[in-house]
Amino acid sequence: MAAPKIFLTGASGYVGGDALHALLAAHPDWESSITVLLRNRSYESVFRTRYPSLNLFFATYDVSDTSAVEAEVAKNEIVLHFAVSADHLPSAQAIVNGLRKRGGAGGIYIHTSGTDVLLDPQVGPEPPEDGVRVLDDWEGISELRSLPDDAPHRDVDKFVLSSGSDTLKTAIVCPSTVYGPGRGLVSQRSAQIPGYTRLILQSGRGLQFADGKTFWNAVHVYDLSRLYVSFVEDAIAPDGRGKATWNEDGYYLVESGIYHWGDIAKRITSEAFRLGLLPSEEVSVLGKERESRDILRPAGRPITNYAVRAEAIRARRLLGWRPVEGTLESEIPNIVRAEARALGLEVRE
């Protein structure tokens, strides 16, 4: 398999850094054919030390750098976009413009979004009378293509979906809560559950939203990264034998199951108490009013979700993707320890 020319953003981030690790673990001979965009020159030495053959491209997404980004993108067959990808339209536009400059040579754009896009801003934090809405990416893909315009990430998703053509293949990878220790060179920390854990530790008590029955999907970062590797391998399959679907049918939800926020609150609190980080295992219940939701903001929007969940079918069916890592609940002890250390708290073993 010839090494594809890949342009990757977000290599210093959590998901992008882990995906880069997975790509080069699976294909170490690809190192010299991958270019990573770095916005911070202070990371140069760590990347050059670990990956001496990796191509480093320093730029931002400011207007002043747009032409340079487009020109660099045009040199590559495949773009994996992680950095600020879900909510930053100018970077997506620069990538599409760059790939279009390749003309008939074509290009592939694998864009990272997030399942927050499934959250309807008009739906309040109440159990729906007509039951939970399940959105899947197979029979339900038309629903994913027509989500409300005011949904999170929606403006960027719409642009990516509309940019596909015969020569420019696009796909949106839409993971839910990502957990697990990252293997990237800079950031190894996720946001939602570590943020929730830190909030509990700093508050000195367990905190739960309402009845604890709100829920969301999750996926381990290693499982997610394996999907990106499979995507790239499929994209360069010889003689057009790839099985992935693209453009309007290139919408891939990523999840390995469901968790309930009340269970997570209790698990964090119990572990923190066991380690001497909290005075009791008691969990304080917060109401549904705006003030309570603001307190819980570090956990992200899904902590108030009763209404919708994702079902990832497309990656399983077409790419043979199967999540194999441990559950989110099993990762809680590691998360509590990591956040305690970051806060300078003494852990009792």
Give each language-model segment a name.
Residues 195-222, 227-231, 244:
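A conserved pocket-lining segment of Rossmann-fold NAD(P)-dependent short-chain dehydrogenase/reductase
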Residues 3-29:
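N-terminal Rossmann NAD(P)H-binding glycine-rich loop of SDR-like oxidoreductase domains
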Residues 180-194, 231-251:
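Glycine/proline-rich active-site loop of Rossmann-fold NAD(P)-dependent oxidoreductases
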Residues 38-101, 113:
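NAD(P)H-binding glycine-rich loop region in Rossmannoid oxidoreductase-like domains
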Residues 9, 94-158, 171:
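Conserved Rossmann-fold NAD(P)-dependent oxidoreductase catalytic core, especially the SDR/UDP-sugar
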